[in-house]
Amino acid sequence: MRPKWCKTTVLASFPRGSACTARQLKHSANRIYLDARASVPARRAGILNEDRIELPDDAIGASAERRSTRDLRKPSRAGIQHERAVGLMSRQTDNTYPKPLVMPKRGPSAALRLLIVGILLMGAAFIYFLFRDQLGDGFALVLMGVLSMVGVFYLFGAATGLIQFSQRSDHQDLAHSFMDTQPEGTVISDPRGQIVYANQAYARMTGATDADGIRPLDQVLASEPAASDAIYRLTNAVRDGLSAQEEVRISGGLSRGANGSLAPVWYRIKARALEGGAEFKGPLVAWQVADISEERAEQERFFQELQEAINHLDHAPAGFFSANPAGRIIYLNATLAEWLGVDLTQFTPGSLTLNDIVAGSGMALIKAVKAEPGTSRNTVIDLDLIKRNGQSLAVRFYHRVQTARDGMPGTTRTIVLDRAEGDDSSVAQRSAEVRFTRFFNSAPMAIAAVDAEGHTLRTNARFLDIFSGVVDRDAIDRRVKLENVVHERDRETFNKALAAAFAGQASISPVDTVLPGNEERHIRFYMSPVTDLGGEAAEEAAVISAVETTEQKALENQMAQSQKMQAVGQLAGGIAHDFNNVLTAIIMSSDLLLTNHRASDPSFPDIMNIKQNANRAASLVRQLLAFSRRQTLRPEVLDLTDVLADLRMLLARLVGKDIELKIDHGRDLWPVKADLGQFEQVAVNLAVNARDAMPEGGQITLRTRNIPAADAAKLHYRDLPEADYVVFEVEDTGTGIPADVLEKIFEPFFTTKEVGKGTGLGLSMVYGIIKQTGGFIYCDSEVGKGTTFKIFLPRLIEEKRADDAPVAAKEKKVEKATDLSGSATVLLVEDEDAVRMGGVRALQSRGYTVHEAASGVEALEIMEELGGEVDIVVSDVVMPEMDGPTLLRELRKTHPDIKFIFVSGYAEDAFARNLPADAKFGFLPKPFSLKQLATTVKEMLEKQD
């Protein structure tokens, strides 16, 4: 066991006249345990070969302080010299010690008092003997009574320990011995500044030779400017009842160079207040002065050695840094700082992180190094660092990782070598090694080499990055089988592909799989056989490359979903067009029948039932067209705040009394351009959908707000461009939508409601309207907490025009003239016979002269036969041989002012793009009624060009 050196300082003080009894030793002793073999200062204090000493609390008023210095294999020379100087190395058995120069006067002891009492009693007895005749027997009885009382009191005091003789003196001697033999100077003064105690050490320090030369410490240091402030602070601390210490440096020491030396001496001065008792009428002040010059010199030597060690480490020919578990660099030597271009004057611990200096996927290599709890681990890593100027530096890490016993990571220490440096003979080889390592660890794909049994031999940084949750560096070092990073369901396919690589096949199909434990991450493996003709890589049987295809899979799923929605939309649009033709014929025929039947007619209800169901079917077709984005929109500038305010009453009636409707209007909303009626339909559909999700009641919140482009970019919604938007949200507190259902909610005819309670077209129509408007719709939902639909409408930024003034709600239609009759000549072009027949009868019933054609070619022939005597043409859009837009272009060549109306089940903009921008025409969407047809024709004829 090597010796350990410690310094123990005990400041002992006591008030004058205090007594140390066995009771005090038993109940208030402070035990100080010292290693007599190791503690030289303890020997200097007179504590020799004692495992334990007990000092009474009343006698020792200061503290026991242990200061540990550096562990040494042998005691220092200074310590041995000081030990010899004190002269206490040999064991002492007597109680001799230097007497103090100033000692408080002691009052008479108990024995002395008893002796005086005894003498007085003997004198009284002698006087009685001489004058017994005169005094009589009464005096003798009184004297005997007094003596008996004194005897009883003595016996009682001795039995109870109240009267003690030698024991009190022994304890006083022990305390005095401890104080007087202290190597530190000790002086105690009363409230008037008079010294009541001073030991020989204090006299030597101050140069006093007798009691008259002893001065209080504040007077000794009064002429020392360097110490006056320290004495002032100590005095104030004592006045406040506190203990304090200061260290001062005095030229020549306290004795002012009495020994002929003016060398500076360091002192540690301690002060504390003591209870003075009634005799001193106030507290005493105990001062202790210790010469710590050797200690300060040792500290200076230690500091110089530390500075030299830091200087050696800073300018070593290798870089060095240390990082905490969070990856923040807490130390960086000058060599590495110079390599990286880091200004050490600006560097502070934690101001740099490993991510700031490690390039590419190098962090994956560093993070993969882990140690077992309570151990450390060393590893070698080749990677690139990033200089301040952006250039890379090829280095080799000798990396040490420590882990605490509880498993918490500790501070890392790393030596960094520049791989580009070396002798001339190894430059080419070193350069090739650097280039390969840089390529290997910087490759964007994971690379691993395996042996013939599928065990992993080596991996690059990207491999550890991708598969960090499956394998770590320890597993790679143990040569774990590569199949462990493949999901169990795909391992058979993976092993077959790996066997093909072992067999030397050149073309092997890649293997797609997911990470074990995280099936949301997709991985694709590529196998390549190893042909090693030179025998340099005899162990390697195949090289496996892997890329993460999670984003690719997500894009593929999005594309498939988009194509599916587009295909469904095209199908829905085609079906809707055909249905519109059928419904148009039914509705117009119903109107013709109703004109010939009164309400009292028995068949009138049946005809009305036919028309009502036809209109209901027409509503479903409109929803299909909305989803397929083929309905006609009339966009206008809208202020959503006003639109929702006008809708509030309607929405409140729709959601019912059990559901609270809350509308949160955003401030200063930007204008948007949308079809007012269609937007109202969107709001109604979403509110009704939210209502149905809360059968037991809840809350629906409609919210609007502006989102700048910068905030929109942070949302990470799929396909949402970075732009300014006005967001319309519909939030409910309903049951929520499961994830598997959430992907299908916008598909037409998809519904989770019971049969007869929903068509499955509500959200499909919302989706189509928003897409056709140029906006985006997303749904966030959590089962059991509710659903939020978010609609992003692009901000309208353009100069305001008179006809684009924001509107709050749908303007009331101006009442049209009830007279729908006319005498104009109409050319009706329609390939559907039923629709054409109904249109002809409807217009003829209003007084029009109608000519009919089944195609565009036939219409041109009729126009030629009539010599152009046609006032208006009503034409379908999609027809065989020649469609409606082509017919319009041909007619305008010879009849530029002819009026033209298109009728179609598709949206107006679906065919308007095929016409000149200045083309003028009317539009009537299918299905339409007899009245709607007559009204449109009448308005077009009366319209002034």
Swiss-Prot record:
Residues 825-941 form the Response regulatory domain. It catalyses: ATP + protein L-histidine = ADP + protein N-phospho-L-histidine. Disruption phenotype: This gene cannot be deleted or disrupted in the absence of a complementary copy expressed in trans, indicating this gene is essential in B.abortus. The modification 4-aspartylphosphate is found at D876. Its EC number is 2.7.13.3. It is found in: Cell inner membrane. SMART domains: HATPase_c, HisKA, PAS, REC. Gene3D superfamilies: 1.10.287.130, 3.40.50.2300, Histidine kinase-like ATPase, C-terminal domain (3.30.565.10), PAS domain (3.30.450.20). GO terms for biological process: peptidyl-histidine phosphorylation; phosphorelay signal transduction system. Residues 171-212, 313-341, 432-505 form the PAS domain. It is an enzyme of class 2 (transferase). Residues 574-797 form the Histidine kinase domain. Keywords: Cell inner membrane, Cell membrane, Kinase, Membrane, Phosphoprotein, Repeat, Transferase, Transmembrane, Transmembrane helix. PROSITE patterns: HIS_KIN, PAS, RESPONSE_REGULATORY. GO terms for molecular function: phosphorelay sensor kinase activity; protein histidine kinase activity. SUPFAM superfamilies: ATPase domain of HSP90 chaperone/DNA topoisomerase II/histidine kinase, CheY-like, Homodimeric domain of signal transducing histidine kinase, PYP-like sensor domain (PAS domain). Pfam families: HATPase_c (PF02518), HisKA (PF00512), PAS_4 (PF08448), PAS_8 (PF13188), Response_reg (PF00072). Signal peptide: none annotated. It is a multi-pass membrane protein. Its main location: membrane. It comes from the Bacteria. The chain crosses the membrane at residues 111-131, 139-159. Component of a regulatory phosphorelay system that controls B.abortus cell growth, division, and intracellular survival inside mammalian host cells. This signaling pathway is composed of CckA, ChpT, CtrA and CpdR. CckA autophosphorylates in the presence of ATP on a conserved His residue and transfers a phosphoryl group to a conserved Asp residue on its C-terminal receiver domain. CckA-P transfers phosphoryl groups to the ChpT phosphotransferase. PANTHER family: SENSOR HISTIDINE KINASE, TWO-COMPONENT SENSOR PPRA. This is Sensor kinase CckA. It comes from Brucella abortus (strain 2308). The gene is cckA.
